[in-house]
Amino acid sequence: VESPLIAERISNAEIVITNKTPISRTTIDKCPNIRLIAVLATGYNVVDYNYAAEKGIPVVNVPTYGTASVSQFSIALLLEICHHIGHHDKTVHEGKWAENADWCYWDYPLIELEGKTMGIIGFGRIGQAEGRIAKALGMNVIAYDLYPNESGRVIADYVTLDELFANSDVISLHCNLTPENTEMINRNNIAKMKDGVILLNNARGQLVNEADLADALASRKVAAAGLDVVSTEPIKADNPLLSVPNCIITPHISWAPKESRSRIMD
């Protein structure tokens, strides 16, 4: 339920600056003086931008501030999935290595990325930045985007969405949330993916049907997921993804290094 305080506090404003506070059709109608809405983020789905456009109100965002931090974080999630660094560090500090009969041990299968295929859905600035890192790791990169461009072709081969699902060892989401792609990661599309695929989501939680993903993680159709976003934030205690062990969830921090936060204000 939308708080009435939103419209109350911006009722006389001409310029509205927001981040996570929603600006809905109802709020826009209650605030006739608004001339500009600025979203201090890359994603702007907190604003009913279609209705704002109907009313002649520009909606602007900050599309470049988090390119480096979000792409870096996405790869960090992937490397944690591949090597379980946090777990092994914890067991060493708990004494397992000191007590081990062999000179080393690993508690999970470890994964080498070279030669594997990363499929990136949403190949704008962040997707392309992640693609460059993936290529530096020796991965093959394919991408799906509604608007392919030449800078992307230097990094990846553009493919259809079904081709990406079928051929990717790792799938990474970096697309805007729209009515058309809401819950695009669902039971039907997961069935098109390779067995043992890894899923990364640093875009919007609503891109994923969380119950379907939890089922796929439990069956190991999806080997692991690294998520910095979920459908409702903060996460609800009954989110089904909390019950599956092969799912890393972080509290929407990929954007948050000091350097990127400074760029928002610049």
Q: Where are the model-predicted features located?
A:
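An N-terminal-biased, well-structured beta-alpha scaffold segment characteristic
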Residues: 1-60, 166, 186
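Phosphate-binding beta-alpha-beta segment of Rossmann-like dinucleotide-binding domains, i.e.
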Residues: 63-117
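N-terminal Rossmann-fold NAD(P) dinucleotide-binding loop
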Residues: 127-128
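A conserved FAD-binding loop/helix module that cradles the flavin
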Residues: 253-266
